Amino acid sequence: MIFYFSGTGNTKWAASKLASATHEDLISIAPYMRADDSSHTLAEPFILKENERLGFVFPVHGWRVPKLVREFIGKMKVQRAESDAAENSASAGSKALSDAAESKALSDAAESKALSDAAESKALSDAAESKALSASAGSRPFVYCVCTAGDSIGLTIENLNEVISQNPSLQALGITEVKSSYSLIMPESYVGLPFMDVDPKEKEIWKKSKSAQKLAVICEEIFDRKEGVSRLVKGPIPWFFTKVVGGFFENVLITDKRFHVEKDKCVKCGICANVCPVGDIKGGHGEYPEWLHHKDCLTCFTCYHHCPHHAIKFGNQTQKKGQYYFK
């Protein structure tokens, strides 16, 4: 089971490759968090099949896990499939029969060989403890994370593990952190600051090529459930960028209030409203787009990058800047 969030498509590409490699379900987080969509709900638990991996794939926002993804992980419920419960029940029944046979054999042996009751009891207790420890060790799902970023990720994985460790549903499955984590350097898409723009075409192509090679290795390791891998580009002073700069991003820069449309360029096609992952835009079908100013906007710039006429602006920060989405 792979949970992913994607704006401009970098992460969806990576998540899709992982789904193909592991033959596991791909689940988009965005529909469960949209204010305008009641067809998805977090009230019902997600069912984790027998031996299924649990993956989280998302872009890095401000050297952190995106706020929407953190909220989703904090609220989600995960349970094992009923077949697992049935198997455990059958295993318990089999164990009971085995224990009964074992008890009879020991009783017969005790009668014929005059074994002490104390020795027999200890042998059975040790066997039961060994079986319990073995079952417990094999019950935890393999949990991993792949995050995409234009550059470094800071303490994003530490940020993720903190959220995971506080989810009671995941705790019940023995999950308190990811077992392996990876970052992929992908083409830039954040254009909300004066010094930030999309990559030149040559660099975009190079990043995609390198990431495709790295993702192939990641897919193999995740398929094999390889634990203890931490292949991350944290960058310099990771705590500063996640704690200080990341806090500034969330508190000041994540807002839809600076978005506007140049009406002489806009054709009212509605593409921006359709691609917004959180449903924060209404428009199209003959109407200019309007940002709804609800709290879920991530300033992911998906609307900006998908506008076919480059009519969407973010204050004065996007003047003469490029557009990018994964193709």
Please annotate each region the language model reported.
Residues 2-4, 8-25, 30-33, 45, ...:
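FMN-binding flavodoxin-like domain, especially the glycine-rich phosphate-binding loop
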Residues 4, 47-48, 136, 252, ...:
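Generic structural signal for beta-strand residues in well-ordered domains
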Residues 39-41:
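PRPP-associated nucleotide enzymes
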Residues 236-270, 274:
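A mid-sequence, solvent-exposed acidic-amphipathic segment
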Residues 261, 267, 271-292, 296, ...:
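Iron-sulfur cluster-binding cysteine motifs and their immediate structural context
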Residues 324-327:
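Active-site-proximal loop/hinge segments that shape catalytic or ion-binding/gating pockets
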